[in-house]
Amino acid sequence: MEINKIYNEDCFDTMKRMVSDNQTVDIILTSPPYCTPKDDARKNTPKRFKNHDVFYDVFEGFESPEFYRKWTVELFKAYDDVLEKDGVVLYNLSYSTENPYLAYLCIADVIKYTNFVVADCISWKKNSALPQNRNSNRLTRVCEFVFVLVRELELKTFRTTKEQYGNMQNNYTNLATNFIEAPNNDILSTEVNKLNNATFSTAFVNELLKIYAYPNYTVYDSFMGTGTTAVACKNYGCNYIGSEISKAQVEFANKRLSEGLYSMKKPDIKCLF
């Protein structure tokens, strides 16, 4: 299997090929599609997304929350087949106003029905909260979660780059925390929003890579979208593999990678914390 490539296909097909080719990855870093019911996916929702009709250009949603939960379990079973020993899954999953508890049910199902458990939960504070919640009793969500999932048998051995200097009694300054501040996304353009209205930023991915990746690691994004994970990996010195069902998003991602669009300064790996 070719690395440093985004495959225009369903992620389950990509992972089946990984297994057949004995291709493994060190990190899985992704944000799955929202659980938008199929009958609502093509409806205009002006209160939440001004000038945008849908989240994605191709994907039309899931049949039901119950289906989404089962799909999540199958996804993590597939992850188990391609993730290296002591590897990590960095799963950016937030909750919605319509179904605020679904994300937690999905993670609970993963713990119950797969080999994975939650090792950490990172809070990502965005620079703005969009869409703003106009519900009478709900908060506007400026933070999202990144669930750090590892195999239960590897809970004490999974890999990070984290170095703690001193000990808990006399040195707190160099301790890595579960809090990240990073922009929502790289760009706010009509072109990208029509393709994918739920992207994250290269700065966000870079913060995660600083904690869990070394150069030459291979990172897999099962929902690559417009290529943000690939761009961040390229800058960081990691290899990447991506899956994306939207041909238009793959083409846009390849354009970003070839032209260096929306990239960032390569980090100093020696000064992580």
Task: Locate each region found by the language model.
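Conserved phosphoryl-transfer catalytic core
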Residues: 51-58, 259-273
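Short, conserved SAM-binding/catalytic segment
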Residues: 1-2, 235, 254-269
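Core catalytic lobe of class I
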Residues: 1-252
